[in-house]
């Protein structure tokens, strides 16, 4: 929350983005230099802090610069690029390991992309907001929450319930192993999921600019329900991989659209705070979802876990249908939702 609110208070996002991505760049050399588990833990911890700092200001900056008519496509593109990086990074690491056969050398190579990001940010020119439009004198102002409409809190609630239905992708790997997928082929599950996510995120964002965003999000929920049901009944690896593919497509139809809805339903001077609150709720719900899913897996098995996920997705779909009357997330050019 704090980094997003601070970016609203300062009227600029770039400094916090540099801090967040800079921390990530600083931690990268620590991994090849680490000689203990404690050192790796510290490096990873600082890296996660950097991710937390940059998350809300980054999404708020996208909302600041994206033209309203193509805001969904812009967030979809951001999701696609983020997933491409998460997909190509491990793939490149595997290829380098096969070529160099030296883990430390591969870890040093990872320093380069992190530094390039910082250099690109240094050249970034962001729009400035006049001081008089900044909402409060202090970045920590609970009064700011009163500025958020029912529409915004409704999107946060839908997103939280959605996240409860979308537990960690680690359960997809567990399901594949349960069905007999050999350990050397386990990464294939994440490859299929990430590839489908990457390919669907931008088209889904574009679609949300031309249809009601809530309808596109409903498609994402229906895809999640279908993925859960398929993963619950799958008795073979091909069926399981089809479920993973549907899971990836549902991510493409939901994550960017949810971010766009947050941008649509929050005041322009509180975008950072809005994304910070949304990310906080999402993080808490993801933790709860993984804990509950782990307990269900241990107590009732894999199928019941995925059925429960489908149930939560159905609840989110019902909440989605109960949108506040004043909610209008479609651009002025294309009407209201």
Predicted stretch roles:
Residues 30-44, 232-243:
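Helix-loop junctions at membrane interfaces in 12-TM secondary transporters
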Residues 126-158:
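Juxtamembrane intracellular "pre-TM" segments in multi-pass secondary transporters
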